[in-house]
């Protein structure tokens, strides 16, 4: 049976220059061939588990035993975890096998609108991220994009990103199929 690692190796052999993997980290992490593993960590133990179920300890154990240091935490900031940004930054800095942390704001899909942040809350989170950058935390986002993310004043969709999810190919991501969602996009990479 083929593994995710087999697919990463095959993509490299096909000529893809960069092969990144996005994961929730609940399975052992053995992907040294991946350029970057974007691993969802949505806060400290309490907040992460409130967002993603009781997975925090499993994820941290899997990171400890990962076969490479190509992991980047990937946090979607929302109403539940907005006060844990500093914690995730410091955890990224202090955890073996973690190279950096990357952020997004929650994109308010119809069934999760209550999790979205106000403009003021986004600005506050960006100030915390900037402080962490100044402390030397390896943040994988561009500070110059923060004003656009706070105001939602960047062009969407991102035509450079193509996502295959459950057999459906989308420009930018699955949010493109939800009416009026692109204008509320929280993906930092789109503005960057």
Language-model features, listed with the residues they occupy:
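Membrane-interface junctions of multi-pass transporters
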Residues: 168, 172-192
